[in-house]
Amino acid sequence: MTLQQQIIKALGAKPQINAEEEIRRSIDFLKSYLQTYPFIKSLVLGISGGQDSTLAGKLCQMAINELRLETGNESLQFIAVRLPYGVQADEQDCQDAIAFIQPDRVLTVNIKGAVLASEQALREAGIELSDFVRGNEKARERMKAQYSIAGMTSGVVVGTDHAAEAITGFFTKYGDGGTDINPLYRLNKRQGKQLLAALGCPEHLYKKAPTADLEDDRPSLPDEVALGVTYDNIDDYLEGKNVPEQVARTIENWYLKTEHKRRPPITVFDDFWKK
């Protein structure tokens, strides 16, 4: 088995999908989880205005709507959380995403004050954060807020991780990567677009250039620039297609060096890091 085949198998990626079937699969997955653990009353998700959180948010709300109707349990809710750092440049996209999702509840937590306070506390201890590390601080502060909300609403935190993100480890460890349940896991980027199109999402929300937008020195830096490959390249690779050798090497290097991000904390029983 080639490394490409191993990666595809590990991430559960498929060369083709039926959008309606995958929508149903994700909704049923979320519903089954909630029914298995009846003490869970809410799904909590940060909404950025990008493709992934828009899709995950819509699926969460659809799952909650169906489950309330089927069970009569009106205590179930989906909570969409806005988590700007100061003023967000694409705030209108966030509002458009919320209008599309129609969440039961929308909360806004501006993380700038908390990030600056943490940065100052570290500075006083003699640690000056780089712009890159400050970006990770933002991602972790966003996740901390979501877990606080989940803790106070008997909820779980929903993630947006999918195959095209997991393969490169393009997320912050214990930041946006630290979630309870990931309904998009298995899909690549173009497949996520297919689901949103089938759901009637406004096109500009999934045709915009994806960006983590964490670094102050490089605001709105496109993911594809940071990664050195395009999402079309990544999607082709995940679909088992032949890609240029340099593209394959770049993707595989990302996968191998970020393996620790896709695993629990390393113990004496792990040996993947020795290979």
UniProtKB/Swiss-Prot annotation:
Family label: Belongs to the NAD synthetase family.
Protein name: NH(3)-dependent NAD(+) synthetase
HAMAP family named in the record: NadE_ammonia_dep
Species whose genome carries this gene: Escherichia coli O139:H28 (strain E24377A / ETEC)
Function text: Catalyzes the ATP-dependent amidation of deamido-NAD to form NAD. Uses ammonia as a nitrogen source.
UniProt keyword Protein biosynthesis present: no
Catalyzed reaction equations: deamido-NAD(+) + NH4(+) + ATP = AMP + diphosphate + NAD(+) + H(+)
Superkingdom of the source species: Bacteria
GO molecular function, one term: ATP binding
Pathway(s) this gene product operates in, as recorded in its UniProt entry: Cofactor biosynthesis; NAD(+) biosynthesis; NAD(+) from deamido-NAD(+) (ammonia route): step 1/1
Enzyme Commission (EC) number: 6.3.1.5
CC annotations in GO: cytoplasm
Residue sites binding deamido-NAD(+) per the record: 140, 173, 180, 260-261
Binding site for Mg(2+): 52, 165
TM spans (from-to): none
Binding site for ATP: 46-53, 160, 189, 211
Coiled coil: none
